[in-house]
């Protein structure tokens, strides 16, 4: 008998949570577990066509902020009969400021209630601290509602559930083979972007939002570009800060050097086109993009606050303090002033020479989606 779950956490932007969900549902046996998706967006969500092809229903609610009364009315009506339709609800969370999905699931007798943390901090706390206080209050109440707690990393679990909470770590696993270095994909994307084979291309994959620190990324690239005026940057993603970023790019005179792609569903080819991956996030749960970049055998330069649970290809994994500033980041990336454990960082090559297939290392580190999906499937089906 097929078990049916209600999934939350999908948005119109194909970010890390969305990537985790898609990696999971693509590898779970549909004859055992199927999913529907509860969303608060009028727009088409990421991967919606693929989800519908899998047989999923997309339950669209009126926006909570735009139409609060209509949202509440439709929301309550939907949950009233949800206990009869669903075997469980799987809530993907960035904070506990709002736990309505958990409380309404409990109230309406959905049997299995799962909370999965994908975040290790939240700079989105409002100035009055209301969201933070709500998060802390709900954290103390969580065991009244959620049957099972998952987290993408220990840091994400401690932030969401508390340091003494009983949670299980499920890594944001990927299809490692799909991200293995491919010269063919590299050539294809570079041709598409009109970037020559011997141009040094830096890049990142992430939303244009405060958490991902896009303004700092641009500042780092500005320093890199001063040293190498022929280099380019590709920012794969979209978000609310895009207009601000494009304005700043213009002010720096980097319109021809810094490219923003917008939202992309399949990012695998873009990693192949890059020569180095820059990732100065303010905080992360466990970033899928960093796992994907390592799977592509890219040199990765990242914030020193990101959990070492993400370290897979050690020789490509370089942490740099954010407070060092953009110039220090650029110098480290260029190999002028390595800060990684006192060792000089290797200079980033101009051409992708020696890129390897590191898929077995990704799998050995516990980031193989086949293994992770099987583990989750067992829980969702058997409990």
Language model region names:
Residues 241-244, 254-264, 270:
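Active-site donor-binding acidic/aromatic loop of nucleotide-activated sugar
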Residues 38, 290, 299-304, 309:
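Short hydrophobic beta-strand element within catalytic cores of glycosyltransferases
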Residues 3, 7-15, 19-70, 240-242, ...:
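N-terminal strand-loop element at the rim of the active site
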Residues 74-77, 180-195:
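A short helix/loop element that forms part of the nucleotide-sugar donor recognition site in Leloir-type
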Residues 155, 173:
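Carbohydrate-associated surface elements
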Residues 94, 263, 282:
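Aromatic "clamp/platform" in nucleotide-sugar-dependent glycosyltransferases that forms part
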Residues 15-23, 200, 204-223, 240-246:
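A conserved mid-protein helix/loop that constitutes part of the nucleotide-sugar donor-binding site
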